[in-house]
Amino acid sequence: MSNSNDNIWNNTEELNELLRIRREKLNILRSMGIEPYGIDRFERTNVSSDIKNDYENFEGKVVTLAGRIMSKRAHGKASFADIQDRDGRIQIYVKYDTVGEKNYEIFKILDIGDIIGVTGEVFKSKTGEITIRVTDFKLLSKSLQILPEKWHGLKDPDLRYRQRYTDLIINPEVKEVFLKRTKIIKAIREFLDNRGFLEVETPILHTIAGGAAARPFITHHNALDIDMYLRIALELHLKRLIVGGLEKVYEMGRVFRNEGMDIRHNPEFTLLELYEAYTDYYGMMELTEQLFAYVAQKVNGTTKIVYQGTEIDLTPPWKRITMVDAIKEYVGVDFNEVKADAEAVEIAKRLNLETKEGMKKGEVIALVFDELVEQHLIQPTFVMDYPVEISPLAKRKHDNPAFTSRFEAFIYGREVANAFSELNDPIDQKERFLEQLKQREAGDEEAHMMDEDFINALEVGMPPTGGLGIGVDRLVMFMTDAYSIRDVILFPTMKPKND
């Protein structure tokens, strides 16, 4: 394609003139008795893919389609155009002798971007392209904006995200990502439903922000005159349902964290959390690797994917390693030999890591892992047994209470899942909440709040339970080879353009 249309975007005066001409055409059409937005309903017999995938059966038949004009080529008293619908593009052929003088004049006035409905006979052009020989057409909607021919001709790199509607029109590969996202979410539900899980809905507005170490968004409930929080996790309400006897529950929904934004983080994102009574984190490992493999097979037809040029094999079983052993393998430090907090802090300093005053050994272990190990975990890996200091909702390991029965799954150096053997001891849970409160009072806005009702639920009695959280957007990123989380969220959070 020519760059001529792209150059328009660099010339404000020329762009404004073209926009003015489009509005002028609107008035011309109305003067001809055509109301550009007057049709409420248009009945189609087919979409483009029906015809293109089964030409032999459609050849010579009359069909009715609708779509957006994406290109237009006039040749005297005959014109070709491509219209685009949900499934793709198809060529149409409009001839003066067939549609009549007035209709042909109307067609000549139409612009790229206009939406039309056409009726005509299916045939192949001289070049062999499947085409509709139009006998009648109707203008369904007049476009008053100019469609860019290709996005790399635009100066504003964020425009694709700000105007996703245009992005979807111009770039079919973008639409494919979001169609695949829908299939991924459907496959997740299929997998869990087939395992007997019950999908539930829990509140989005919370009086206590809990279930994750994150800074919440705060809002105000006028009728109750109280501040409330947009949920940062689904965990604590779902565990209440386990206490209530539902045994196997999951929820997939939006959560909100008032934190930084980068290629892996959007303040509003989709989270899957599930809880299963009478199992532990080993059961969650098996479920996680089976879920990823099921989704990949269902959506991509294989358990091997290529992400940013690297082949990733999702076939179970995945590698399993403790956090301490992973540090030993990749950093050469054995924290099993480290007894005191001060000694751990000194090791971190020797590794040129930034430490905070009063750090405990477990926090140092997590710091070393995050900074020096994560990036090495390319193939699917379960990193197990996290320090208790960073796992306030996970059960302690019976043979080593300084660590918890928790894992995170990593792919391509990124965390994709987080799971525990859930803490069901109400006394231990309250003590950990109190420790988190001390951290909040010391200025840690991400530390957990005290949730007395959740403690009460645990006192009623929660069975041994395994819990799992998966960031759905990151899963979609891997399945679609998307570089940024913004590429898999239809309308990512953006700073207003006028700021």
From Swiss-Prot:
GO cellular component, one term: cytosol
SUPFAM superfamilies reported in the protein's UniProt record: Class II aaRS and biotin synthetases (SSF55681), Nucleic acid-binding proteins (SSF50249)
GO molecular function, one term: tRNA binding
Keyword Aminoacyl-tRNA synthetase on entry: yes
A Pfam cross-reference name: tRNA_anti-codon
Keyword terms: Aminoacyl-tRNA synthetase, ATP-binding, Cytoplasm, Ligase, Magnesium, Metal-binding, Nucleotide-binding, Protein biosynthesis
Cofactor(s) listed: Mg(2+)
Gene Ontology biological process terms, A to Z: lysyl-tRNA aminoacylation
Main location per the UniProt record: cytoplasm
Annotated catalysed reactions: tRNA(Lys) + L-lysine + ATP = L-lysyl-tRNA(Lys) + AMP + diphosphate
Location(s) in or outside the cell: Cytoplasm
Binding site for Mg(2+) 2: E415
Annotated S-S bridges: none
Cofactor note: Binds 3 Mg(2+) ions per subunit.
EC code: 6.1.1.6
Positions that bind Mg(2+) 1: E408, E415
Protein family: Belongs to the class-II aminoacyl-tRNA synthetase family.
Subunit organization: Homodimer.
Protein name per Swiss-Prot or TrEMBL: Lysine--tRNA ligase
Organism ancestry: Bacteria, Bacillati, Bacillota, Clostridia, Thermoanaerobacterales
